């Protein structure tokens, strides 16, 4: 296969970059009055304005030519057909099947998986309705008032993001908490004010062996039994999202209350699988299906829309443009909606675990930059924190602004103030303020350099009518498919995560060295050995 940087389409982009890299957005807008209306796209309730990027129509044409040369369309079709595109694990990648409508046909190894998906969704809905209605009671007969999801990675980040994003639509009679960190403080604080007799734990681990999750699950079991006293209580206060029936039963959970999913669902793509059980309980099945419908609408748009009108494709190609030609290393996710406060953290896993790779699908080292670093904070908080660097720092960051026209909680003029700030920040980043403009305002000449804004800092804006379950589904799917687009261009596998394995293996070796009663024989590097000895000394253990 041709190396990416040797492709004529890549070299054409390099030539084009050198021709336009110093052109200011002020000039691009001045020379093209229709730019703001033309460089937009819309699908699944999302309006995507990408006019404030350092591109021309020719840039987009060349990026699409690169996508076509890299067989992006064929790769998209292969994913939707259920081919084993996760080559390193020999798995299909079919999170899109999780939100397919009941009558759809999506095959894996010749079998339609959609009926299985809906069978699990139906079981989830029945259980969620039991909990929400009070028909599911705890061991003492009290109804469940508290839901605690125990998971980590994709078993936590998706559910907690979805719950926080859609909290407005949730049943406020239920308290929903999340425990992920193996740090005991996470569990202690999550359960401090809960009544065990009214608490249901959802233990989310496909294998039911994940270290952090099962450590927290065993602690939760002991916490519940300390109050309830009878081993039989476990079956009324714990359910599992897993495929390991033997371990689930050994824990004391009734396997009738085990909700499974499939090896063609990656953890960071699993929030619409049984991993979303806590979301369904909080929102109710009807709202959860609205979430699925939003995902599916964007899935179909990605699958069928021409690349020049395809939101995820354009978004992904713009990321390639900045990562590989401008050398930008970070993307700031800036949601102007406080309900999306966990969205940047969710995207960190989705993007960085997917595309944080340094070898191609064939195992050859890449000779170009791959995954970007994602971070962010809701507006307007970030404006009083890190926006200074975005506006006047020496580093370029790509910014994604996300906003909604209608507030969920209309209070006075709060929402107009919020959205005015979002539009203003994108405008200020793009166009800045010249020294001449600063001086014309009466600024002293000595102060003018400090109050000048270079501008020419790129951003995207995503705008929707309001934050709904369907809108959230479309938004998440847009980023999922943008990640896929980037991975296809870079010729890497966005669906494995071998990078998490080495640290886990080393930790398994260090645990007994920290806990042993006698001084352990240490054979690490001198720094790690010294840190272990210092830790043992501080814990009062022989070192």
UniProtKB/Swiss-Prot annotation:
Checking Pfam families in the record gives: PGI (PF00342)
Arranged from A to Z, the UniProt key words for this protein are: Cytoplasm, Gluconeogenesis, Glycolysis, Isomerase
Q: Does the keyword Cytoplasm apply?
A: yes
Q: Which GO terms describe its biological process?
A: gluconeogenesis; glucose 6-phosphate metabolic process; glycolytic process
Principal localization reads cytoplasm
Q: In which pathway does it act?
A: Carbohydrate biosynthesis; gluconeogenesis; Carbohydrate degradation; glycolysis; D-glyceraldehyde 3-phosphate and glycerone phosphate from D-glucose: step 2/4
EC primary class = isomerase
Residue numbers annotated as active site = 353 (proton donor), 384, 504
Reactions catalysed, semicolon-separated, are: alpha-D-glucose 6-phosphate = beta-D-fructose 6-phosphate
Molecular function via GO: carbohydrate derivative binding; glucose-6-phosphate isomerase activity; monosaccharide binding
User: What GO cellular component entries does it have?
Assistant: cytosol
Its Enzyme Commission number(s) read 5.3.1.9
Output the superkingdom of the source species. Bacteria
Locations listed in the record: Cytoplasm
Q: Which residues cross the membrane?
A: none
According to its UniProt entry, what is the function of this protein?
Catalyzes the reversible isomerization of glucose-6-phosphate to fructose-6-phosphate.
The entry sums up its family as follows: Belongs to the GPI family.
This protein is called Glucose-6-phosphate isomerase
Question: Species name for this entry?
Answer: Roseiflexus sp. (strain RS-1)
């Amino acid at each position: 296969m041709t190396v990416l940087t040797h492709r004529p389409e890549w070299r054409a982009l390099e030539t084009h970059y050198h021709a336009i890299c110093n052109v200011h957005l002020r000039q691009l807008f001045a020379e093209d009055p229709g730019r703001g209306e033309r460089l937009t796209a819309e699908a699944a309730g999302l309006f995507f304005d990408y006019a404030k990027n350092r591109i021309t129509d020719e840039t987009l044409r060349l990026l699409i030519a690169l996508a076509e040369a890299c067989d992006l369309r064929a790769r998209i079709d292969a994913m939707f057909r259920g081919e084993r595109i996760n080559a390193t694990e020999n798995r299909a990648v079919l999170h899109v099947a999780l939100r397919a409508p009941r009558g759809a046909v999506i095959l894996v190894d010749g079998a339609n998986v959609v009926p299985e998906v809906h069978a699990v969704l139906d079981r989830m809905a029945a259980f969620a309705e039991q909990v929400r209605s009070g028909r599911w009671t705890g061991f003492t007969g009290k109804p469940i008032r508290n839901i605690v999801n125990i998971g980590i990675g994709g078993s936590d980040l998706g559910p907690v993001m979805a719950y926080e994003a859609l909290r407005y639509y949730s049943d406020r009679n239920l308290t929903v908490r999340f425990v992920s960190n193996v740090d005991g403080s996470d569990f202690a604080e999550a359960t401090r004010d809960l009544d065990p007799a009214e608490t249901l734990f959802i233990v989310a681990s496909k294998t039911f062996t994940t270290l952090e999750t099962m450590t927290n699950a065993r602690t939760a079991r002991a916490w519940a039994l300390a109050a309830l006293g009878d081993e039989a209580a476990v079956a009324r206060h714990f359910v599992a999202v897993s495929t390991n029936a033997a371990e689930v039963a050994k824990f004391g959970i009734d396997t009738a209350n085990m909700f499974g999913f499939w090896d063609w669902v990656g953890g960071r793509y699993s929030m619409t699988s049984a991993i979303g059980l806590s979301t369904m309980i909080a929102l109710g099945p009807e709202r959860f299906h609205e979430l699925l419908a939003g995902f599916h609408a964007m899935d179909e748009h990605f699958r069928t829309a021409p690349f020049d009108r395809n939101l995820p494709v354009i978004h992904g190609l713009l990321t390639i443009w900045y990562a590989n030609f401008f050398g930008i290393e970070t993307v700031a996710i800036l949601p102007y909606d406080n309900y999306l406060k966990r969205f940047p953290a969710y995207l960190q896993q989705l993007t960085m675990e997917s595309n944080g790779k340094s070898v191609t699908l064939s195992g050859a080292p890449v000779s170009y930059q791959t995954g970007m670093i994602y971070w962010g904070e809701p507006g307007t908080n970030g404006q009083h924190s890190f926006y200074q660097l975005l506006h006047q720092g020496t580093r370029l960051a790509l910014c994604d602004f996300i906003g909604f026209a209608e507030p969920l909680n209309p209070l006075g003029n709060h929402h107009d103030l919020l959205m005015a700030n979002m539009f203003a920040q994108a405008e200020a980043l793009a166009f800045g303020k010249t020294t001449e403009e600063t001086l014309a305002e009466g600024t002293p000449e000595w102060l003018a350099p400090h109050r000048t804004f270079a501008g020419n800092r790129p951003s995207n804006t995503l705008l929707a009518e309001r934050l709904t379950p369907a809108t959230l589904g479309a938004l998440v799917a847009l980023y999922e498919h943008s990640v896929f687009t980037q991975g296809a261009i870079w010729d890497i596998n966005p669906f494995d995560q071998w990078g998490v394995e080495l640290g886990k293996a080393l930790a398994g070796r260090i645990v007994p060295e920290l806990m042993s009663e006698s001084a352990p024989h240490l054979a690490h590097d001198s720094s790690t050995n010294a840190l272990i000895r210092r830790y043992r000394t501080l814990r009062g253990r022989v070192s």
